[in-house]
């Protein structure tokens, strides 16, 4: 299994904080957000390579972070403790601003094509912070061999209005309806920026791009995907943080558990 962390956005909602630093490199509990994500992904035994796709503007900052993170990992290993040994590779999507961005789906497609990925795939958005382990949804994915999108039980219709909410079949976990920031959501289940794809379904990402669909947000892709294939969820109740606003960032700094 390969993993892609999408980190090529420009985070205009967090300006001026993110004017000179990308959102995934903002520190929470002593480490950049992206490092927490990499550590969570590295817990999955089948993941043998992690790609972090970023933009040309912030690529040098990610390079510096990766050099420092590798140095720390070596020091930890020398000290006798265990450290994730999954290789991490940076991918530059060549964009320099919101105006020429490829979009999240476009960035995933770029990595698949450029790196010749032909394996099961895990995608994690680079602004996701969560207290739960991905191992449970990974095990469900292995058993079902279907496209899987982990879900967060927010227990809040207000929170669902601000995100993509999902109605699922309670017995099978299959997606019945997905609503992007609906004014009257039918569910408090929130779609997370995390996706598992079986290898044989990767061609759907290429098909979506080739058909000139909106490459910007995964919500558009998810709605299209539900018309092509079964999509299932795995529900988590442990905390998840959408670090898209200053208030959410402050909450994450208090309540996130590495």
Predicted region positions:
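N-proximal low-complexity "stem/linker" segments adjacent to membrane-targeting elements
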Residues: 1-5, 10-14, 18, 25
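Active-site metal-binding loops of divalent metal-dependent hydrolases
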Residues: 10, 127-128
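Residue-level signal for inorganic ion chemistry
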Residues: 34, 111, 127, 166-168, ...
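Conserved donor-nucleotide/metal-binding helix-loop-beta segment in metal-dependent transferases, i.e.
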Residues: 133-161
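Conserved N-terminal catalytic core of the sugar/cofactor nucleotidyltransferase
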Residues: 2-5, 13, 31-124, 136
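Catalytic-core segments of class I nucleotidyltransferases/pyrophosphorylases
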Residues: 138-142, 169-242, 246-258
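A short, conserved beta-strand element in the Rossmann-like catalytic core
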Residues: 128-131, 240
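Short catalytic helix/loop segments, enriched in acidic residues and glycine
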Residues: 20-35
